């Protein structure tokens, strides 16, 4: 059973996340030749204050 973990910065809507889960499930099932019902997708939303880019938090970069 494939387990896919995705980490994204928080702020996307439920529909966007549902579409992401659906599209990733379809791609994994097709490419690994497994039933879509066996694919697990975990989406972790990370606060921008906890997401670092170039030594600074994404939140601080957005304020600049």
Task: Report residues per predicted region.
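A domain-level signal for the structural core that forms small-molecule/cofactor-binding pockets
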Residues: 2-64
């Amino acid at each position: 059973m494939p387990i896919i973990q995705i980490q994204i910065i928080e702020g996307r809507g439920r529909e966007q996340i549902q579409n992401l889960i659906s599209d990733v499930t379809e791609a994994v099932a097709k490419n690994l030749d497994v039933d879509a019902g066996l694919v697990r997708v975990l989406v972790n939303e990370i606060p921008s204050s906890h997401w670092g880019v170039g030594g600074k938090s994404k939140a601080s970069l957005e304020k600049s």
